[in-house]
Amino acid sequence: MINDIKKDAQERMGKSLEALDRNLASIRTGRAHPSILDSVKVPAWGSDMPLNQVAAITVEDARTLKIVAHDKNLSAAIEKAIMTSDLGLNPSSAGTTIRVPMPALTEETRKGYTKQARGVAEDAKVAVRNVRRDALAELKKLAKAKEISEDEERRAADELQKITDKFIADVDKALEVKEADLMAV
């Protein structure tokens, strides 16, 4: 019973960490990386499709992404979707190939992205703490129903705190790596 609660909490905290990784990957750095375009949706075949499902995205060089549409008729729609996204990118089309140069980040935009990364990391920490709170509430409920002793509850709460501390440290580490990446010139 206690192990199920801890295991569930650990899984949910792990999902929060995965969400953090996805969110941090979508924050643009000076280098070209296909995940930057994950949020771009392209109107194709009657619905909005993620860009990575309608085109192949590759890194051409450190500052350029190369996009080749699976269907050449979608090239114009892909280019327009990238331009209208809030990423501040300006694609250029050459036949069926679309190149997306990554503009160099100014000091101001670096600081803005760093602030955004800190906000995303703080949201992840809050999510991890909410999972801990839910698990502690379940433990308290079991103790109140006399299904576990107070000692078992306290021991499980201490173990939950250790698990939480580990995940918070992982969040801090991911943020540190992203900040270093953002501030590298």
Curated annotation (Swiss-Prot):
GO terms, molecular function: ribosomal large subunit binding
Pfam families (UniProt xref): RRF
GO CC term, one of those recorded: cytosol
A GO BP annotation: cytoplasmic translational termination
InterPro entries: Ribosome_recyc_fac (IPR002661), Ribosome_recyc_fac_dom (IPR023584), RRF_sf (IPR036191)
SUPFAM superfamilies, sorted: Ribosome recycling factor, RRF
Main localisation: cytoplasm
Domain of life: Bacteria
Positions of transmembrane segments: none
Keywords: Cytoplasm, Protein biosynthesis
Entry's localization field: Cytoplasm
PANTHER family tied to this protein: MITOCHONDRIAL RIBOSOME RECYCLING FACTOR PSEUDO 1, RIBOSOME RECYCLING FACTOR
NCBIfam families in UniProt: frr
Descriptive protein name: Ribosome-recycling factor
Organism this protein belongs to: Ectopseudomonas mendocina (strain ymp) (Pseudomonas mendocina)
GN (gene name): frr
